[in-house]
């Protein structure tokens, strides 16, 4: 577990360093210094978004993600995650239940999404987050069907990060589609 956590932290730091290089090329300096002063271990794009706001580069977190840190953002850098079997084994070794979080946010087409969920199930994954903030009901239904096809639990989540975020409040989410609600986990 410690090795996986250390690798995840290293990957987050490398991603921040890549974003920092892009910012420097645009004349914006100080990101790494800012991040090193924060009282956290897991650097995230939320921290970088706050740096962009503080520096007058972005107007809001929404603007920071849409224009600079999202998939097509000006300063974006790819995330580096561990392999699915490693993630599943680590979660289960710690006594957790391995749930694939918000899969419709990974910018995958239906074929790749189906493949991801199938691979996750084959690696011992136990569930998929089907209902989460602002997900289209048709996509929720599709996610529920993929859970059933792969014998996975259907999970829900609000994707709550902080009261300042506007997309959803803690504990608020849409109900699971009826066809997958019999095999649900919270």
What kind of feature is each model-predicted range?
Residues 1, 5-8, 59, 82, ...:
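Charged catalytic cores and adjacent phosphate/nucleic-acid-binding surfaces used
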Residues 2-11, 36-38, 74-75:
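Flexible, glycine/proline-enriched loop segments at strand-loop-helix junctions
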Residues 7, 19-22, 26, 51, ...:
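Residues that form generic nucleotide/phosphate-binding pockets
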Residues 10-37:
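Conserved phosphoryl-transfer catalytic core
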Residues 27-31, 37-42, 165-166, 183-186:
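Generic structural signal for short, solvent-exposed loop/turn connectors between secondary structure elements
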Residues 38-103:
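Conserved acidic, metal-coordinating active-site core of Asp-based
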């Amino acid at each position: 577990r410690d090795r996986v956590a250390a690798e995840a932290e290293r990957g987050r730091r490398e991603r921040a360093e890549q974003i920092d290089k892009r910012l420097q090329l645009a004349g914006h300096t100080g990101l790494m210094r800012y991040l090193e002063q924060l009282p956290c271990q897991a650097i995230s794009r939320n921290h970088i978004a706050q740096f962009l706001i503080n520096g007058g580069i972005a107007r809001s977190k929404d603007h920071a993600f849409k224009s600079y840190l999202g998939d097509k953002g000006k300063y974006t850098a790819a995330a580096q995650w561990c392999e699915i079997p490693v993630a599943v084994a680590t979660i289960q070794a710690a006594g957790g239940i391995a749930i694939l979080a918000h899969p419709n946010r990974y910018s995958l087409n239906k074929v790749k999404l189906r493949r991801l969920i199938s691979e996750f199930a084959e690696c011992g994954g136990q569930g998929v987050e089907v209902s989460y903030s602002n997900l289209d009901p048709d996509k929720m239904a599709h996610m529920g069907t993929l859970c059933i096809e792969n014998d996975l639990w259907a999970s829900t989540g609000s994707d709550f990060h902080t009261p300042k975020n506007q997309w959803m409040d803690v504990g608020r989410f849409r109900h699971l589609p009826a066809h997958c609600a019999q095999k649900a986990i919270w």
